[in-house]
Structures are given as C-alpha cells and as structure tokens.
Amino acid sequence: MSGIEKAWAAGDAGAFAALHAPMATYLAFDGTLMVGRREIESGHAPLFRGIMRGSRLLSWDRRVRLVSSDVAVATQMGGIVMRWQGDRATPSAKRVSANTTVLVRDGDRWLVTAFQNTRYRPWADTLLGRLMTRSSG
C-alpha cells in the first residue's frame, strides 16, 4: 500500500495504475467508477497534472484481514493534503474518507483489485444527527 502513496506523491498516474490488477475497479468518492488500469491511469493523469499536483495521500487506522493466502481486504481512513496546505500533518475534515481496498497476490507482490472510497461524515455531526440526539430541556 505504500507504493500507492509514493506513486500519488510523484504524480505518476502510470505507476499508480500499475499497482492495480489489470481489470481492477476503482470507485471514487464522487461515485465515478473506473474499470481497468487504462481507466484508472486516464482518470488520475489530469488530476495529477492539475488540482492534485503536489498533493499527498495519507492513510491511517488501517486494518488488514487475509481472506485467503492470496486475497486481503484492507480498510482505512485516508485523505489528501493539497499542495497549498504545506506540511500539514492531516487532511482537512472535508477531505477525509473511509476506504476499502481488496488486494490479490500476484507472485511476490500485491495488487489492488477493488477500491472504494466514501467521504467520512459521522452521522452525529450532520444536522439530522444533531437534531435527533439533542436533549430536550
């Protein structure tokens, strides 16, 4: 998984896509679905040249479970620190996501075969959550 963060930091869409299985699925936070290395690369290349240029991908609270000797499921929190945010240690709250990554063994390396990204919005922090949990007084 560290290779993903390194490819992101380098802004290298080809290297990023190469860490995915040939027909991997990549579901972005906004619902965009990319299937296969070509779509993953072409979907990230303009981002790395544009708005995401110089950004850093961070992950934490990673949990990995081996489903079999050749399949693993990782869940983690993650987010992007944009280039204009400097040396910030954590992403801003609006850029934090919960991710699920399915990896498959390919010889001596692991490849991402499925990735799903959801913006993290704790229910209790939403307007509805606050209204439903406030105490009457």
At which residue positions do the language-model features occur?
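A beta-strand edge to alpha-helix "cap/lid" segment located at domain peripheries
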Residues: S2-G14, A18, T25-G137
